[in-house]
A protein has these predicted regions:
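N-terminal first-folded block
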Residues: 2-40
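Short, well-ordered beta-strand segments in beta-rich or mixed alpha/beta enzyme
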Residues: 2-9, 39-66
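Non-catalytic surface loops within mature trypsin-like serine protease
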Residues: 10-12, 58, 92-95
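Glycine-rich beta-strand-turn "strand-cap" elements at beta-sheet edges
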Residues: 41-46, 76-111
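An amphipathic, aromatic/His-enriched active-site/gating alpha helix that lines ligand/cofactor pockets
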Residues: 24-36, 55-90
Length: 111
């Protein structure tokens, strides 16, 4: 699995426009073959700072995404709204997910 993690810094007056651009990009990416999830979220303590979290089956899937017209549209649209250049990293990971009892984790930390 490939995980993409990025930081996007948007001009405060253009946050709503950026949210629309991100919503459209997320919708397109989630419909692509090999996309497991694609989400944007704004950092609560830092308005205008958005994080993107993507999960892809493999390199081929993310390469297809980068070549898609929707990704090119996103790049063009978001570029004019940025305060500074975005930061983005890809990580190759093994899928080792398993259920976790979050109540137990909190309880164990309190001991």
């Amino acid at each position: 699995m490939i995980i993409g993690l990025g930081d996007i810094y948007v001009q405060i007056p253009h946050r709503q426009v950026a949210e629309g651009v991100m919503t459209e990009a997320s919708r397109h990416a989630q419909a692509e073959d090999g996309c497991l999830s694609f989400t944007f979220a704004e950092v609560l303590e830092e308005p205008g700072h958005f994080v993107v979290l993507e999960r892809w089956n493999d390199e081929r899937a993310i390469e297809r995404h980068y070549r898609s017209p929707a990704f090119a549209d996103y790049q063009r649209s978001i570029a004019r709204l940025l305060v500074r250049e975005s930061e983005y990293r890809l990580h190759r990971v093994q899928d080792t997910s398993h259920p976790v009892d979050s109540v137990r984790i909190v309880t164990d930390q309190d001991d």
